[in-house]
Amino acid sequence: MKVVDTEFVISAVSEKQYPKDDLPEFALAGRSNVGKSSLINTIVNRRKLARTSQQPGKTQTLNFYKVNNELYLVDVPGYGYAKVSKKQRAAFGEMIQDYLETRADLKGLILLVDARHDPTADDINMFNYALYLDIPILVVATKMDKLKKMEASQIKQKIGKSLDLKQENVSFLPFSSVSKLNVDKFWDWIEDKM
């Protein structure tokens, strides 16, 4: 897919705020600071469309980005950040759960995991939850540029120990925002699910 136009549309916290134009949507989930905003900026070739931060927990709403007037990428709040209150964490969880369970336009979940670390308990829970909801999943191993060649060659096996990548509705993609590794394959997956 050639990206010619991308725009931030809305930050939403409830269904009444979601876009109403029935375009396919793809949610990006992962722990805080896993690289969701960097991935968005890289795949649409815009440096500052999605705000990146060194401070975890910045995204606190569902952020809808329209691509080519054909689809939405939906950046959801990162999970696992300890400095967010339990009350806020519960609210984020409820907002994400409502979105994943009720949004008819949702065509896939892009689950980002940091290639340098094993998937967290939260990653495993999100993965299993999407499987339960029968949502197609693309597991994206971010920050591949930070791995040594030997580590990079074994990344699918490493992540596959925690996440069942052999499930029918699951795909896997190593990714780097620095080297732009697999941007085309990312869009191939999106187009296949539309």
Curated annotation (Swiss-Prot):
Keyword Flavoprotein: no
Amino-acid positions noted as binding Mg(2+) in the UniProt annotation, renumbered to this chain: 37, 59
InterPro entries given in the database record: G_ENGB_dom, GTP-bd, GTP-bd_ribosome_bio_YsxC, P-loop_NTPase, Small_GTP-bd
Entry binding sites for GTP: 30-37, 57-61, 75-78, 142-145, 175-177
Domain (EngB-type G): residue spans on this chain: 22-194
SUPFAM superfamilies reported in the protein's UniProt record: P-loop containing nucleoside triphosphate hydrolases
Gene Ontology MF annotations: GTP binding; metal ion binding
GO cellular component: cytosol
Gene Ontology terms: biological process: division septum assembly
Keyword Signal: no
Record key words, sorted: Cell cycle, Cell division, GTP-binding, Magnesium, Metal-binding, Nucleotide-binding, Septation
CC cofactor: Mg(2+)
Alphabetized Pfam families for the sequence: MMR_HSR1
Region forming the signal peptide: none
UniProt xrefs under NCBIfam families: GTPase_YsxC, small_GTP
HAMAP family recorded: GTPase_EngB
Function of the molecule: Necessary for normal cell division and for the maintenance of normal septation.
Stated family: Belongs to the TRAFAC class TrmE-Era-EngA-EngB-Septin-like GTPase superfamily. EngB GTPase family.
Protein name (record): Probable GTP-binding protein EngB
Organism this protein belongs to: Lactobacillus gasseri (strain ATCC 33323 / DSM 20243 / BCRC 14619 / CIP 102991 / JCM 1131 / KCTC 3163 / NCIMB 11718 / NCTC 13722 / AM63)
